[in-house]
Amino acid sequence: MLAKRIIPCLDVRDGKVVKGVQFRNHEIIGDIVPLAEQYAKAGADELVFYDITASSDARVVDKSWVSRIAQVIDIPFCVAGGIKSIEDAGRILEMGADKISINSPALNNPELINQLHDVYGQQCVVIGIDSFYNEATDQYEVYKFTGDEARTQKSQWQTIDWIKEVQSRGAGEIVLNCMNQDGVRKGYDVKQLKAVRDVCEVPLIASGGAGEIAHFTDVFQQADVDGALAASVFHKGIINIDELKAELTSNGVAMRKRHGLTAQAEGVNP
């Protein structure tokens, strides 16, 4: 059995970590590097950094903080934001990131997934998907440019179809951001995640909705995701990562021990 991952998410805007509700009304949480170091020491298995306005501002992620993070943490981290070319990705990986994630740029140029896979390997390529449940049509729809309220727009893709497409092009991991649940702390969208799990053959990370420890237990046990990403519950001290992992372990969810990059769960592979 593979060990599951707990992944704090740090949304970055103008050099600060911020957090909104359903991708709106962002408040400043703090500085990037100290927060990264804090989470690494607190027992996080991995970190994800989203420069949330990079794509909508037509720029690549601000790389000035990437190398500083690599110097102070000993766990893997992923960086996202406006990565539109293999050169953009290469510079971020050279600065110490373990993975790069693309979202809107992949929707605009799906061939980019193939290119990144061929140059850097599948293990480096994460696809972020912002999925919105449309009650009127009873469909899950993929949105882009969600970091900028004024530019957010629906793409041509339905979520399940886009999952299949990115896998066929070489995605190594998928982060499903459930927009309806984002920041409201009422639980992950287990129904949608189960539907995605049925077609997703690569590691699947749940994002959006964590509010209490039971929500993590539910998403791991019911949707069989490989990792759970959360922001506000960690930023605001609502959930302690060590306590979360202890509770998950007691509920039969395999978790990694706190040994940085060599972390392993008892009796399982990392």
Curated annotation (Swiss-Prot):
Single annotated GO MF: lyase activity
GO biological process: L-histidine biosynthetic process
GO cellular component, one term: cytoplasm
Enzyme Commission code: 4.3.2.10
Pfam families: His_biosynth
Pathway note: Amino-acid biosynthesis; L-histidine biosynthesis; L-histidine from 5-phospho-alpha-D-ribose 1-diphosphate: step 5/9
Subunit record text: Heterodimer of HisH and HisF.
Family classification: Belongs to the HisA/HisF family.
UniProt protein name: Imidazole glycerol phosphate synthase subunit HisF
Encoding gene (name): hisF
